[in-house]
Amino acid sequence: MDYEFKKNTLDGSYHATFSMGHEIIGRWLIEEVGKDFEKMDTILSQIGALKNSTKEWRLLGDDLSLILQDHEAIIQANYLFSEEEEDFDEDMHFYDEESVSCCGFEDFELVLQAWQAFVTRF
């Protein structure tokens, strides 16, 4: 998984670009995490606690949520949790694939630590 973080010096906004299949992680960092260091620390603590566990932990966001389970971090659009998703036609399948992404705890932990370091610096 490749990614790049940037800050717009004109308006102070952050940008997180991720490789194909992981784009939603960048959106989640921008929209749901931002510069919330307490949230980042909580997530990192949960990853550490779940590394040798079969338990699940969820962080529900406004539009996107994080699920930690089975040694994977899953970022998912909240609308996918609803039963209404079955009502979407087959043309929406590709869009759904862009609305969920997962990676292992180790990779996700590195991404979150890199984001934390980036927003601390800038």
Swiss-Prot record:
It comes from Photobacterium profundum (strain SS9). Signal peptide: none annotated. Belongs to the UPF0231 family. This is UPF0231 protein PBPRA3187.
